[in-house]
């Protein structure tokens, strides 16, 4: 009797394995949800609404962008982590997955996922409301030193938009007052309306800066950017800060290897599409493709860097 049960168990296991293999071979059979853990209209949302159709061409299936905002990106991260590991949920991520984890805002980290690929990198810019009196970064610094804790900075607390000004604070010996916003779009609307003084932004806002609706004070790249040659780097102003927001794709831990291979192949094809760099340039970002092997090492290194930054900034909670 026991041998019969053992044989039956073996047969059932074999059938399950064959069924899983067939299902993976047919992947994708239904739409794939791409979770963007911030509000619609923000940088990550815009980038992946451009990128998803390029991935679709390679996959032969539909990718639907789903904005799951809240709790500094944590709500969407948790939903992605807890989704079935079947390839029908993928996660749009950037460096905040490290910063929110180490500042105690989130309980989800990059190690809860499988890497697909790194897609873009966007240098950060110190950006001021047009209603502020500062003509340049030097005048901001001088004013901030006269009134510590009075200049307001919009940020998603614990995220990259918080880490960047905190690094500037520390390097320049300043003290800002932070106002929390869930995502880029509401933060930039507050800045445009003069409800806050400063925020981290990037070249997606160049049109508004050119129109006088915002003021670019300094960029956090290693050298001046050709798109904004008159904007100095923080380093040339004596503020030793370089910072960029790096965006990639992850899948839930345990996603089948053959499904991951298809997602990675589609990500590679999309990132190498000849029209993609030009599309990203319009959105103020650079294509920075790394395959899953390169991205794995990048995530590991970036995680350690963010932990160190959280410690240096007095924000480490883990």
Report residues per predicted region:
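Bacterial N-terminal signal peptides
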Residues: 9-19
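C-terminal lobe and pocket-closing loops
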Residues: 121, 205-272, 301-304, 318
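Bacterial N-terminal signal peptides that target proteins for export
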Residues: 1-11
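Hinge/capping helix and adjacent helix->loop/strand transition within the periplasmic-binding protein
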Residues: 79-88, 102-186, 239, 244-279
């Amino acid at each position: 009797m026991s041998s019969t049960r053992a044989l039956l168990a073996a047969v059932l296991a074999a059938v399950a394995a064959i069924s899983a293999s067939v299902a993976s071979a047919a992947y994708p059979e239904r739409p794939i949800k791409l979770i963007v853990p911030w509000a619609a209209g923000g940088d990550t949302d815009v980038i992946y609404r451009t990128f998803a159709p390029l991935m679709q061409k390679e996959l032969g299936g539909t990718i639907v962008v789903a904005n799951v905002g809240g709790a500094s990106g944590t709500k969407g991260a948790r939903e992605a982590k807890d989704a079935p590991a079947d390839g029908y949920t993928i996660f749009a991520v950037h460096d905040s997955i490290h910063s929110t984890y180490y500042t105690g805002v989130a309980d989800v980290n990059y190690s809860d996922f499988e890497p697909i690929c790194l897609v873009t990198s966007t240098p950060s810019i110190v950006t001021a409301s047009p209603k502020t009196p500062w003509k340049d970064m030097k005048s901001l610094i001088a004013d901030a030193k006269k009134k510590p804790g009075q200049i307001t900075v919009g940020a998603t607390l614990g995220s990259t938009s918080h880490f960047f000004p905190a690094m500037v604070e520390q390097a320049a010996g300043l003290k800002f007052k932070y106002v929390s916003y869930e995502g880029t779009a509401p933060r930039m609307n507050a800045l445009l309306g003069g409800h806050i003084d400063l925020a981290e932004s990037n070249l997606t806002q160049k049109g508004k800066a050119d129109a006088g609706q915002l003021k670019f004070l300094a960029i956090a790249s290693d050298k001046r950017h050709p798109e904004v040659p008159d904007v100095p780097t923080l380093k040339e102003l004596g503020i030793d800060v370089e910072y960029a927001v790096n965006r990639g794709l992850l899948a839930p831990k345990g996603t089948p290897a053959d499904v991951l291979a298809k997602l990675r192949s589609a990500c590679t094809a999309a990132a190498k599409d000849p029209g993609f760099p030009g599309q990203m340039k319009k959105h103020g970002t650079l294509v920075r493709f790394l395959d899953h092997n390169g991205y794995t090492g990048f995530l590991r290194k970036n995680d350690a860097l963010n932990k160190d930054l959280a410690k240096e900034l007095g924000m480490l909670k883990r």
